[in-house]
């Protein structure tokens, strides 16, 4: 009943026509808008196929430094994610120790690892490479590779 009274008053004041025109405009605007889906049906879903050929091959560099100044170059190679084998047999003991300290600090800072392969031969590996030395654990457990003294 109150709706009829309001309609009559709106008609008397001339507001009825404006109200109907506004409603028609809103209906036209909503009809003209196109609905775009958030997820298109053309896209691939959960593509979990990995190409075998995308694997990057690891590069190994063997270095036999002649001086301590080569430590920066060795660590730059480690920074570039290369595996480095360093042979320090030709260096004096003090210089080899300084070089080893520098390489150890750099490998720690870069998240890599430094392992002794043999006396005066070391391997530096980036954080993406895991180095295990099973030979060293065999030496410790059996007191030698070939246990001649039983």
Swiss-Prot record:
One matching Pfam family: SepF
Subcellular location per the Swiss-Prot or TrEMBL entry: Cytoplasm
Primary localization: cytoplasm
Disulfide pairings: none
Protein's organism: Clostridium botulinum (strain Hall / ATCC 3502 / NCTC 13319 / Type A)
Keywords, sorted A to Z: Cell cycle, Cell division, Cytoplasm, Septation
Organism ancestry: Bacteria, Bacillati, Bacillota, Clostridia, Eubacteriales
Gene3D superfamilies with a match to the protein in the record: SepF-like protein
Protein biosynthesis among keywords: no
Gene: sepF
Key word Ribonucleoprotein present: no
GO BP: division septum assembly; FtsZ-dependent cytokinesis
GO cellular component: cytoplasm
Protein name (Swiss-Prot/TrEMBL): Cell division protein SepF
Similarity section: Belongs to the SepF family.
Quaternary structure note: Homodimer. Interacts with FtsZ.
HAMAP family per UniProt: SepF (MF_01197)
Biological role stated in the UniProt entry: Cell division protein that is part of the divisome complex and is recruited early to the Z-ring. Probably stimulates Z-ring formation, perhaps through the cross-linking of FtsZ protofilaments. Its function overlaps with FtsA.
